[in-house]
Amino acid sequence: VLDYEGTPEYTLCCIVTDKEEIGSVGATGMASHYLENTVAELYACTADYCELAVRRCLRNSRMLSSDVSAGYDPNFASAFEKKNSAFLGRGICFNKFTGSRGKSGSNDANPEFMASLRKIMDDAGVAFQTAELGRVDLGGGGTIAYLCAKYGMNVIDSGIPVLSMHAPYEIISKVDLYEGYRGYCAFLQGAKPVE
């Protein structure tokens, strides 16, 4: 958001939350009313505040839920489906769905949002890849995307592939980190109403 060039036509924001690893609970977790209360407070600064406007604002939002993605590790190849895995050095990763036991407890991004995201990345020349978080019924994980999707907004998980996630030493590619930065900037620059 800080590197946005020019004046945005539409409102842009970056929301930082914690407690994701324990279910996004508490006053600063995404399961709280933090987001909707903040939007309501902003709307309250206008002359024509109403609850329906807050709900419409949330519904018409587009979000990249930024987290890391499991990078393919050849030493533990059985934990991945190679053709549905993120690889280091291939750019920012988009996870259409997360969860475990199939798609349980996840958000599943719609194809129209995926298409608009691909266009934004292609137009900006950003290297990107799509993946899932490990082999079905073996891997998996959760993020905050499903908590924001409950408002009807378009949400997808995005982030940098990482090897040895949650280990004392994690490994990422500097290329992916840079493409992630470029991807987030392109997403903000390409902000437009949901069609």
Where are these regions (language model features)?
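Acidic/histidine-rich catalytic neighborhood of metal-dependent amide-processing enzymes
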Residues: 1-93, 140, 189-195
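His/Asp/Glu-rich mid-to-C-terminal helical/loop segments that flank catalytic regions of hydrolases
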Residues: 2-13, 160-195
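Conserved active-site and cofactor/substrate-binding residues in soluble primary-metabolism enzymes
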Residues: 30-38, 108-116, 139-142, 175-182
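Short alpha-helical interface elements
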Residues: 39, 142-146, 153, 172-173, ...
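Noncatalytic linker/hinge segments flanking ATPase motor cores
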Residues: 53-62, 102-113, 169-175, 195
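Active-site-adjacent substrate-binding region
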Residues: 69-76, 80-169
